[in-house]
Amino acid sequence: MEYIIFAAVMACIVILFMAKGIYDYKQSEKKFIRKRYSDYGVLPQREYKPEQFESISHYYQKHADGFCIDDITWNDLNMDEIFKKMNFTYSAAGEEYLYYVLRRPCMEDKELLHREEIIRFFQEHADERVAYQVMYHRLRRTGKFSIYDYLDYLDGLGRRSNMPHYLALILLAVSIGVLFTDVAFGILMLVCVLAFNNVSYFKVKGEIDPYIVSFAYVFRLLDAVKNLKSKVRKTESLKEEFEILRKSSASMGGFKRGSFILMSSGRMSGSGNPLDMLLDFIRMGFHLDLIKFNQMLSETRKHVSDIDSMITTLGKIEAMIAIGEYRASLEEYCIPEFADKRGLHAEELYHPLIDEPVKNTIATSSSVLITGSNASGKSTFLKTVAINSLFAQTIHTCLAKRYETPIFRMVSSMSLKDDVQGGDSYYMVEIKSIKRILDLTLSGEAPVLCFVDEVLRGTNTVERIAASTQILKSLR
């Protein structure tokens, strides 16, 4: 009787903890929803650890094709800080795709117009936007590693067999059977088998733990797709994206089947759950999660392209939501106009990192040489034009009253440093940087919009003027 009372009390305690956890989670989500309405357009205050920020670029590194913004130009424009101000995302898929968007300008306006459709829909429909943001908040981030790091590491696991785990189950079943014939020996055997199973469990679990995190994220991806299908309003703007998600998720049924063995709801949501303690004891003894892990590993390897499609598509939608919210944070912005004629026309441009900027206007159909006294804002103006040129072909948003330009490939050489480790002096770094610009102009694709600040400042005046003259002639 005492055992029954004890078990009942323990069950009540577990239920109370579960109820408290569910209540806290619901309250936290309600608070999140309220803030998404009230704080729309308020700049994010997130702090990034170096390893977390570094991993954000990994989707881009995997998908960098065609013309991309190179590291020199990215650093010249201080784009890391601009990205942080723009990062209104809540999932790894969203923030990694937003980074990708900023580093890969569109070379035709068709994709930009499609992005504009999605951005505008979420700007004009607050309830739908918040519903999506709640879904992305549940999807969450992956910590200091990108999901693509985990997917890459899968190959390092090699082929894995479930035979040792089946053997552990057989030994456990035999020891339980012996209990019915010889209690003393059966208990001894059961203790030994459980000890062996626990030791072998933790040895293998230590190897696979990082990948369980990735599987949990894939599961949340599938859950997000399911929520989009059933709970979130569908729009014509997202018709193409919904079709991609439908096809990608349809092939992943084997991955989800029985996944609760490996991943409890707490593991998948990242929120934790008291029931996990009980489940962990079962996993230790029976190795059920290790068996399921190997099955899910096999499924993941077969469907890497489908997982990539889901990450890309879900990330794209959230990135567009973030761009819309970034627009709401701006004092003034415009939608860029793209023309076939050569030239650049912009009214009242301003820099995104300056709180009280001085706005400037530029209208030119040829090369421009900017002169002026020290600290007059020449470099800042160059960067302002360059950033808005990049914004026009990425987020379809310019910090200006009006912005008109053709489609460009944009490149710069501004904030260079000597490369001590590489053995290059400041002068050689400048020469190599300028050469990459000249090489780009000779490729014969879209026209190049280049920004050079203080050409060849690392050499003497006579050589600097002579070399600069020839460089400028080549860039005309």
State the predicted function of each range.
Residues 1-366:
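Alpha-helical bundle segments enriched in helix-capping/polar residues
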Residues 323-326, 330-476:
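ATPase nucleotide-binding head domains, primarily ABC-like/P-loop NTPase cores
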